[in-house]
Amino acid sequence: MKKAIYFFLILMLTASIQVGAQSLDGTWKGVLSVGSQKLTLILHVSEAERSAKLDVMEQGAKGLPLTVNVMENDSLNVAMTQIGLHYAGRLRNGVIEGTFSQNSFTTQLIFNKGEVVQKRPQEPKPPFPYRVENIQFENQSAKGTLSGTLTYPEGYKEGQKVSVVLMVTGSGPQNRDEELMGHKPFLVLADRLARHGIASLRYDDRGVGQSTGDFSSATTAALATDALAGIKYLRGLKKFSCVGILGHSEGGSIAYMLGAGGNADFIVSLAGPACKFDTLMMLQLNGLSKVQGAKEDVVHSVAETRQLLLSKDNSLWMKSALDMNFSKFLPLIKCPVMALSGSNDLNVPAEFNMLSLQNGLPHNSKNVIKIYPGLNHLFQHSPTGNPLDDVNIDETMSEEVMNDVCTWINKVTNNNH
């Protein structure tokens, strides 16, 4: 009997030690339900630094600093006052149970310990069968240095003339891999190009990564000068037979701008706006709101669209972008153009944008204008095109799109690969 009591006391003591050893420290994962949408929240807690940060996976937000009100024993109370966000929870049995609120919205939210493991099967891993160089080039007009990665084709030999593409990212500050939603589209695409005999240069946006400069004050026109500096750098190397530009989203519009100035030997535009930007934004706002549950249009005119956007973002970039009409550059382009879109692209609606291209581009038998069924703005297969789903899609970019891009570039540049 005494042995039984003694054994029971040992169990109780062990349990109490385990409970007492529970710690808020580490990475926690929770799923927030907002209507029909689900957001994956990652909470990073450091008891030693008494700090907490938040990632919102579907929105590509990382390291958002939280104000710590309480971090003691099993209790956690954090907030982000500027957006009215608040979370109060308690650690029980290895999970944090609590209440999430933002302004008038309140719901229960549970965090489980652990990282989010994302599958990215297309992402290349070293060692690579091609040469890669970290380089820098100067934008003299902006007094900035852009840092990037120059990737040579598989089997490249010094003195061999090959085609090269300058890769230009979409809107917002992005690194050379155009990293967003846990994907690295430009890394994946650069790898595919190299394996098809095509060199590429991708670079960090100004003020991002290893590039200098101030992104916050940059307009699309200013960012185009960065891309132009990249083209001049590539031509100055005297290693390449043809220098083209490949841009995604805003980068695709920059490709049209530089093509109109005769700066590129060929253009690949991946969902690049080729129309009036304010009209495009009206279609975008209504399309995105409907896929996320709205039953009616949120804006009914271009004027209303401009007013709504400027009330939320009064930056120099937004002001200038709303006045841009990218269709004016199209008639001036003399080089071959490959313009691609996905039918489920809600950011740059394909039918509307492609109509502008068909009407604006001069006839060129080498031009390709194509809409891929079922692809979203990132050229992933997506049933709805909802950007909130991007992070949960394993595919980074459609195999068909990447192969078509490589085949077309080799064809228009007479690169026999």
Predicted regions and their residues:
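Short beta-strand element of the alpha/beta-hydrolase
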Residues: 160-170
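Accessory cap/linker subdomain of secreted extracellular hydrolases
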Residues: 262-332, 347
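Alpha/beta-hydrolase active-site loop
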Residues: 185, 216-237
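Short alpha-helix in the alpha/beta-hydrolase fold that links the catalytic acid
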Residues: 335, 346-360
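N-terminal cap/lid segment of alpha/beta-hydrolase-fold proteins
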Residues: 116-160
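Central antiparallel beta-sheet cores of small beta-barrel/beta-sandwich binding domains
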Residues: 22-91, 97-103, 122, 129-130, ...
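Primarily recognizes the serine-hydrolase "nucleophile elbow" in alpha/beta-hydrolase
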Residues: 229-286
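Short beta-strand/loop motif that positions the catalytic acidic residue
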Residues: 333, 339-341
